[in-house]
Amino acid sequence: MARQVSGGKRDYPELEKCIKHACKIKVRLRGEHLTEGNCLWCLKTLDYMFEDHKEEPWTKVKFRTIWQKVKNLTPEESNKKDFMSLQATLAGLMCCQMGMRPETLQDAMATVIMKDGLLEQEEKKEDKREKEESVFPIVVQAAGGRSWKAVDSVMFQQLQTVAMQHGLVSEDFERQLAYYATTWTSKDILEVLAMMPGNRAQKELIQGKLNEEAERWRRNNPPPPAGGGLTVDQIMGVGQTNQAAAQANMDQARQICLQWVINALRAVRHMAHRPGNPMLVKQKTNEPYEDFAARLLEAIDAEPVTQPIKDYLKLTLSYTNASADCQKQMDRTLGQRVQQASVEEKMQACRDVGSEGFKMQLLAQALRPGKGKGNGQPQRCYNCGKPGHQARQCRQGIICHNCGKRGHMQKECRGKRDIRGKQQGNGRRGIRVVPSAPPME
């Protein structure tokens, strides 16, 4: 380990004290100490290996940079021992540079590796924080101004997943939206909410609650005569560019818009769990469509929402909450305009559903020839390929052991049999076999 190199500490004046302390480190627990020559050999070797850093003074930054490069090297088998000595000496010098006093080079190596791991974790956290900050639409610039960025696709997909798994008005979606939307513009919040998967009736109710919040704001906050003050259009981001909506003077408007959305989600969620909620009114088994429609309309009329929302719920829920038979009958009768058809038209289309005539009609359609299972093709045998039976019922390939004919089994044979179960008449006889020795000549 002890290697002497010409020159001295004058080549590295910034490391004079560091080398002095490094000479107190033991190479092994019961071995000799590092020498000044060992330290100079290490430094000069590293300068030779990494010439692009040769002119830089040996600071903590340079030590860590060189350590990262040395750590990623893979030495040849013949140079492995010298490489380990180089790495251990570098670790000892790094510890002395940081003010530590390791007893042996093994302690120095362990200390540097542990310190390096902590620094890497901090860098990963910093990168993660920068990545999270980069997905927010409003970015604060160094000069103090603000710029706008589109909502990150990863964040949008996470919100979509939560909405699909837990529901658009669930507490999980509300928490996720409140966390992400703190730096969104009002336009971003409303556009993302509109693109989320969910029940159309729920979205109409949410929009109705937002309209109620806007109307309440107009009543309680009339515009002052001298101008100024927030308007509903500013809060909802109407008529604004994204760049203008991202500025600091619109922070209050964005916060109010987010609070309105959260209030709307909570209100619709409470409606969904309240007894008499029209979205929970579904047609029961064997219930006439007229009775179901009467219950549904009564529940919708009792809702504290505006008349346009009531009309929308009547058109939507009168189809989506109906039974499968009624939905099929409406599709068959009303066609593509089933969603826009009035409740009276749907009642007219479903008046015969459940009657004996309707059941006979369904049975006749099911038994209509030429419409078997699958894609409308008649049922065919996989054995012979002929229609009308299955492979387990196929007679092709079966041979009767009584008469020898194909197409039926012995127990189904109509041929004559004797009293003992044998076929009457002279049966076929094969050639008689007589045992004999083989001819030798």
UniProtKB/Swiss-Prot annotation:
Annotated keywords: Capsid protein, Host-virus interaction, Metal-binding, Repeat, Viral budding, Viral budding via the host ESCRT complexes, Viral release from host cell, Virion, Zinc, Zinc-finger
Entry-linked SMART domains: ZnF_C2HC (SM00343)
Pfam families named in the record: Gag_p24, Gag_p24_C, zf-CCHC
Gene3D superfamilies per UniProt: 1.10.1200.30, Human Immunodeficiency Virus Type 1 Capsid Protein (1.10.375.10), Zinc finger, CCHC-type (4.10.60.10)
GO MF, one annotated term: zinc ion binding
Motif PTAP/PSAP motif per record, residues: 435-438
Region described as Disordered: 419-441
Gene Ontology CC, one term: viral capsid
One GO-annotated biological process of the protein: viral budding via host ESCRT complex
Residue intervals of every CCHC-type zinc finger in the record: 379-396, 398-415
Domain topic, free-text comment: Late-budding domains (L domains) are short sequence motifs essential for viral particle budding. They recruit proteins of the host ESCRT machinery (Endosomal Sorting Complex Required for Transport) or ESCRT-associated proteins. Nucleocapsid protein p14 contains one L domain: a PTAP/PSAP motif, which interacts with the UEV domain of TSG101.
Name of the featured protein: Gag polyprotein
Organism taxonomic ancestry: Viruses, Riboviria, Pararnavirae, Artverviricota, Revtraviricetes
Gene responsible for this protein: gag
